[in-house]
Regions:
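Short, contiguous acidic/charged loop-to-helix segments that flank catalytic cores in large enzymes
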Residues: 235-237, 295, 315
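N-terminal amphipathic/basic leader segments beginning at the initiator methionine
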Residues: 1-34
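Mg2+-dependent prenyl diphosphate-binding active-site environment of isoprenoid biosynthetic enzymes
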Residues: 11, 26, 32-262, 329
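Short, amphipathic C-terminal "tail helix"
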Residues: 304, 310, 317-336
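Short, charged, amphipathic alpha-helical segments
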Residues: 14, 18, 206, 299, ...
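Mobile late-domain/C-terminal helix-loop "cap" segments
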Residues: 261-312
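A short structural micro-motif
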Residues: 67, 150-151, 211, 273, ...
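Residues at alpha-helix boundaries and the short loops/turns that link adjacent helices
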Residues: 52, 56, 135-138, 154, ...
């Protein structure tokens, strides 16, 4: 049994293990190649987060989904590079919008070089992803364009907030489907599609990816509250400080409205105050970590991960399917 990737994914098949490891190594080379520029400063900025590491969750899904067809097909590694470049580009932009100063345990690009360079570097990565996509054919371009549209729509919905009368939790889950589920779903879709898997298999894996992506982001929401920076590589409570609603906070507000408990209302008022104040921020984190809303968010994460597992039911039993099931379990384990 060998662990592959940061999730401690146990691969019990030597051929699968070798395929995944070789594929991930090729993706790493592809990422470094795709982020090179004739201008050294652009190379430095574009490779900043590549070299900082990361989970490479999306390329891993491409490699596993490719096991259901010709796992040596030439489009697999480039498509994995595309989804990771797209993901990295969104991180540059997210950190500007969130005013985050730490990403993957290093200074964020905006903290190091300013907002303009960070935004333009994200744009550069999108451009490089498009260049690779052009060689993968019109269907790949269309699939990526649809996912990118959903991703941006999710970001806009998050910024705009729920419309009057809309349940905030439902709105938030829709946001996550766009912001995170779309690209994770495309990772699975590309792996299956590029390997020439049957359309039914492509659809099943896409549904799995969509649900897993939401579970993955919900786990991140929990980690943002529950972990320290050593565990997550990010500043704890970044979303909290910026007033960005995440599921633990939404579950708290839901409970406060339903039960009217004084301590819940007081915590909501604290969250509505200026959390750029370090003492207030630390107190809000402490109270949320001990609040039932955090456990409710963990249960929500488990539910989405279980939905992802259920989506795999039509697939034949094989080591790749087992690995995908284990991956959904690993996502839940991250949330504690």
């Amino acid at each position: 049994v060998t662990d592959v990737g940061p999730f401690g994914l146990s691969v019990r098949d030597q051929a699968l293990e070798a395929d995944v490891q070789a594929g991930m190594a090729a993706v790493e080379e592809g990422l470094l190649e795709a982020t090179k520029s004739e201008v050294p400063f652009i190379t430095e900025a574009a490779q900043h987060l590549v070299r900082a590491g990361g989970k490479r969750f999306r390329p891993l899904l491409v490699m596993l989904a490719a096991q259901f067809g010709d796992r040596y097909a030439p489009g697999i590694v480039p498509s994995a590079v595309v989804v990771e470049l797209t993901h990295l580009a969104t991180l540059y932009h997210d950190d500007v919008m969130d005013e985050a100063t730490v990403r993957r345990g290093v200074a964020s690009a905006n903290a190091r070089w300013g907002n303009s360079v960070a935004v333009l570097t994200g744009d550069f990565l999108f451009a490089r992803a498009s260049h690779i996509l052009a060689d993968l054919g019109p269907e790949a371009v269309r699939v990526q364009a649809e996912a990118f549209e959903r991703l941006v729509t999710g970001q806009i919905l998050e910024t705009a907030g729920p419309q009057d009368g809309r349940d905030p939790v439902e709105h938030y889950l829709d946001v996550l489907g766009g912001k995170t589920g779309s690209l994770v779903a495309v990772s699975c879709r590309f792996g299956a599609m590029m390997s020439g898997a049957d359309d039914t298999v492509v659809d099943v894996l896409t549904q799995y990816g969509e649900r897993l992506g939401v579970a993955f982001q919900l786990a991140d929401d929990v980690l943002d509250i529950a972990s320290d920076s050593h565990e997550s590589g990010k500043t704890p409570g970044t979303d909290l400080r910026e007033g960005i609603p995440t599921l633990p906070v939404l579950r708290l507000r839901e409970r406060a409205a339903r039960l009217g408990l004084a301590e819940d209302i007081a915590l909501c008022e604290l969250l509505d105050s200026d959390l750029t104040d370090d003492d207030r921020h630390a107190e809000a984190l402490r109270l949320l970590r001990a609040h039932p809303a955090l456990e409710q968010a963990r249960r929500d994460t488990v539910r989405y991960a279980q939905d992802a597992r259920s989506a795999l039911a039509p697939l034949p039993d094989c080591t790749a399917k087992t690995a995908l099931v284990e991956l959904s379990d690993a996502v839940v384990h991250r949330a504690g």
